[in-house]
Design a protein with these regions (language model features):
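Substrate-binding/gating loop at the entrance of the active-site cleft, primarily
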Residues: 1-20, 27-39
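ALDH superfamily catalytic-core signature
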Residues: 9-24, 43, 88-223
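Structural motif
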Residues: 25, 57-60, 82
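A glycine-rich helix N-cap at a beta->alpha junction
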Residues: 42-58
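A structured beta-alpha segment of the ubiquitous adenosine-cofactor-binding alpha/beta core
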Residues: 55-76
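Short acidic loop-to-helix transition motifs that present clustered carboxylates
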Residues: 60-65, 85-87, 105
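Glycine-rich phosphate-binding loop
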Residues: 76-91
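Conserved glycine-rich beta-strand-loop-beta hairpin in the small C-terminal domain of fold type I
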Residues: 224-229
């Protein structure tokens, strides 16, 4: 799974309601928090007289081979994969029934007649929840040119930091992987304040969200992708 807490908790509840056991495999950056959640769930099962082994997880650094071995095991009734393209392909070619969820990259259109203050508040609240790890939250904003300036102001009032053109170039050099163009792995799931500090753009504030403006011809570039932060 990619989003350890939300995905494991939701999947565990679905499995338990269906009277099925669960084995969770979290990415290495989430092994600690994933294991802690597993312990909490097992504790709840024990308190209610249920078998704690209904919820299990891979608690050491798992390789792709280990994950594949679990997914292809004949005792597995269903594979639920929320991860990158490689894991999704492995899940759907495992020979077991599989449900896969990849990048969402949800866009939002802010029209000229929108309530800009409400739109900004809802977008900032949604994208900043869980430090942007929710695939279904807003990842790209498409704003009508007629209200762009007013919407930028509304975003800032809602707690966002909207970068200037100069800051965008500097921020990209610090936040994106030079080889892949993707967000640096150590910034995934980090707060807006931590990301700005890493890029040397600490404003002395407690921002809830970093907004990186892009020209229309740049939408297929790195910042047009899903950003899990």
């Amino acid at each position: 799974v990619a989003n350890a807490l939300q995905t494991v908790l939701h999947t565990a509840l679905c499995c338990l309601k269906a009277r099925c056991a669960l084995i969770a495999s979290c990415p290495h950056v989430a092994l600690g928090v994933g294991g802690r959640l597993g312990e909490i769930l097992r504790g709840v099962l024990i308190r209610h007289g249920a078998n704690p082994d209904l919820v299990q997880w891979i608690f050491r650094r798992a390789s792709r081979a280990t994950t594949s071995a679990f997914m292809t095991h004949s005792g597995v009734a269903l594979v639920v994969a929320s991860a990158g393209a490689t894991v999704l392909r492995a899940a759907h070619s495992s020979g077991r029934p599989a449900l896969g969820m990849g990048a969402a990259n949800t866009p939002v259109w802010v029209a000229a007649d929108a309530d800009l203050a409400e739109a900004a508040q809802l977008i900032v609240a949604s994208k900043s929840f869980d430090h942007g790890l929710t695939p279904g939250c807003e990842h790209n904003l498409v704003v009508d040119r007629a209200v762009r300036a007013a919407f930028v102001e509304a975003l800032e009032q809602a707690g966002a930091v909207v970068l200037s053109d100069y800051d965008v170039e500097h921020f990209a050099r610090q936040a994106l992987d030079a080889e892949t163009g993707s967000l640096r792995a150590d910034l995934i799931g980090q707060s807006a304040a931590e990301i700005l500090a890493h890029a040397g753009l600490d404003r002395g504030l407690e921002p809830r969200l970093v907004v990186v403006p892009q020209a229309p011809d740049k939408v297929l570039g790195p910042w047009g992708r899903e950003q899990l932060a």
